[in-house]
Amino acid sequence: MPHQESESQAQAESSNEQLERLPFPPIPYSHILHCSYHHWQPRYRTITPKSRLIPLTDPFVSYLRADGIVLPPENTSPQDEDDLDTFSDDGADEEPDPSVEWQDIHSQIKSTISEFGGKVTPKLNWSAPKDAVWMSATNDLQCRTPNDIYLLLKSSDFVTHDLEHPFDDCVPDTTETTESSDAQPEIPYHLVLRKYVNFNPALEFRCFVRNRVLLCMCQRDQNHFDFLFGLRDTLRSRIQAFFDEHLKDSFPDPNFVFDMYIPAPYQRVWLVDINPWAPRTDPLLFSWLEILHMRDPIGIQEADDDAPEQFVRLSLNGDNLTILDVGGNEGSDSGSESEAEAEGDAEDDDDSPFLPEFRLIKRDDPEAYAFTTPQYSAHKLPREVVDASLTGPGGMSEFLGKWQEILAKQEQEDTESEDGR
């Protein structure tokens, strides 16, 4: 009996695991590399915001991976050994300058900031350190000094994922030889510095492409913007035309996700990012299960091809044309008009363009007005604090009460240990 129970439990766990696993096709290593900024940006340079790519050396990547945050001194001026001996303080415990091993990168960053007017936004190959903006004085990605950049990069879990887990849940490319197929490819890490532009978050959109078909799109910001509903058709046509002209046939993979920005007056479209067709990419207002099961024009055409073949038999009597049979049933004068109308409607449906779904947050959607919950809040505080805040004032009060009990108990233990000395 116990054996049967454990066996049924194992089957249930296996079934749950299969339900939770999304039906993604295998994600090859090459797809992740194709979505790296350094790979696609040179091809689409004219349609992307102004940016500079700085190749990163191994010492700099090691600096990003290292525990702790040690920043270079803000201003370093060369000094002679005599000066150092004269003004050195033997008692001072100064941190070593980490930029000594990557001075060239440090200099390139400073010159790029100056070139772009004193303000840039950083990202690594795939991710921007958006989860670390709480460390910034401006509470955004705006950086004015190299140290602003280093602080964001070293504080970001997103950047850590780029460094440590870029090929999670991926498979080797089938074109590679068996000898080297299991080895993960080397990643040429780059620091991307974009000229800082104060984007209107309401006009940033995420678009999903499957089999080189623009399947659906949605707004990126999790707030309701009433004016977007009046612009939906205009924005959709702009995005579709942009995709058809620039991305449909030029990106190496048939499945991918791209982000774009369409500033007023909604004539120019900017490509902001390209993301993997993978669970790691946030589907935002959709779910991945929903996207993976959507039908696109290719799928609809295949379904129509399986339908029974229909035909029309015609009788030619001089100049008169008589319909004798449509789809195997004889047509009459009374029925021919409705059939012709039906056929006309069907032709209209076939000729009508496929419109990708454009999802916006409505006024009464639960997601609306997400400014009450800060984005990436789980990266800022202990999870217990975040979870307690989501349950409302009661949950937070309960958490604070428990926290005070823990502190009081800790103080009592400290007092008792001191008295026992």
Curated annotation (Swiss-Prot):
GO molecular function annotations of the record: ATP binding; magnesium ion binding; protein folding chaperone
Start-end of Acidic residues biased regions: 79-98, 336-352
Keywords for this protein: ATP-binding, Chaperone, Cytoplasm, Magnesium, Metal-binding, Nucleotide-binding
Transmembrane segments: none
Region (Disordered), start-end ranges: 1-23, 70-101, 324-356
Residues holding ATP: 123, 126, 128, 130, 194-195, 204, 206, 220, 259, 273, 275
One Pfam family this sequence matches: D123
Primary localization class, coarse: cytoplasm
Keyword Transcription regulation: no
Keyword Iron: no
Record localization: Cytoplasm
Top-level division of the source organism's lineage: Eukaryota
Binding-site positions, Mg(2+): 273, 275
GO annotations of cellular component type: cytoplasm
GO biological process entries: eukaryotic translation initiation factor 2 complex assembly
Record field: compositional bias (Low complexity): 7-17
Biological function: ATP-dependent protein-folding chaperone for the eIF2 complex. Binds to the gamma subunit of the eIF2 complex which allows the subunit to assemble with the alpha and beta subunits.
UniProt family annotation: Belongs to the CDC123 family.
Protein's UniProt name: Translation initiation factor eIF2 assembly protein
Originating species: Aspergillus clavatus (strain ATCC 1007 / CBS 513.65 / DSM 816 / NCTC 3887 / NRRL 1 / QM 1276 / 107)
